Swiss-Prot record:
Top-level taxon of origin: Bacteria
Gene3D superfamilies: 3.40.50.2020
Keyword Glycosyltransferase appears in the UniProt entry: yes
Species per Swiss-Prot/TrEMBL record: Clostridium perfringens (strain SM101 / Type A)
Chain's role: Catalyzes the conversion of uracil and 5-phospho-alpha-D-ribose 1-diphosphate (PRPP) to UMP and diphosphate.
Catalytic activity line of the entry: UMP + diphosphate = 5-phospho-alpha-D-ribose 1-diphosphate + uracil
Activity regulation statement: Allosterically activated by GTP.
Major enzyme class: transferase
Name of the protein described by the UniProt record: Uracil phosphoribosyltransferase
Length: 209
């Protein structure tokens, strides 16, 4: 079974409180989501493979550790996942960015794919799938399935807030994918929204309804 890591750093929890607040406007919401994503990226990348190289300082030659040959790709689930990309690129500027477009059918609550654009070397990269909310788990599960069909092998999932149901759903479908969240909330309501959650992340990011 995959590992679930709840990243409860004080700065993350502080910013998450304002992300949840319904009175936080789109501008501040976007900035906070980006900041929390950057902070979470530190933990999500903790186990990236490393290798030793030799460099020369102004004093002498020495050996240092750097990221190994495999590189990172960030794959946001559109559209809300876009809000997490810039923050992550602050820490991983060389990462490539793919895009998977899924929307949730309001009646069935199931994800529907409408767009997919990935780096050509996706099979050679460590993949971090990002989406602010892990609610039913359907979108994340479908995105991961799509990535595996394209050859991706090393995949992590990073979300700001999740429901217990969403985590369980992803774990059953993809027991090899580790999940990183800032907070695991209480439950899903009858409309498939996380409680207490933060509302619709995409609408709050982009000022739409």
């Amino acid at each position: 079974m995959s590992k679930v890591t709840e990243i409860t750093h004080p700065l993350i929890l502080h910013k998450l409180a304002f992300i949840r607040d319904k009175n936080t406007g789109s501008k501040d919401f976007r900035e906070l989501v980006s900041e929390v994503s950057m902070l979470m990226a530190y933990e999500v990348t903790r186990n990236l493979p490393m290798e030793e190289i030799e460099i020369e300082t102004p004093v002498c030659k020495t050996k240092c550790k750097v990221l190994a040959g495999k590189k990172v790709a960030i794959v946001p689930i559109l559209r809300a996942g876009l809000g997490m990309v810039d923050g992550m690129l602050q820490l991983i500027p060389a990462a490539k960015v793919g895009h998977i477009g899924l929307y949730r059918d309001e009646e069935t609550l199931q994800p529907v794919e409408y767009f997919c654009k990935l780096p050509q070397d996706i099979a050679e990269r460590d993949i971090i799938v990002v989406d602010p909310m892990l609610a039913t788990g359907g979108s994340a599960t479908d995105a991961i399935t799509l990535l595996k069909k394209r050859g991706a092998k090393q995949i992590r999932l990073m979300c700001l807030i999740s429901s217990p149901e969403g985590i369980e759903f992803v774990q059953k479908a993809h027991p090899d994918v580790d999940i990183y969240v800032a907070c695991i909330d209480e439950k899903l309501n009858d409309h498939g929204y996380i409680v207490p959650g933060l509302g619709d992340a995409g609408d709050r990011l982009f000022g739409t309804k």
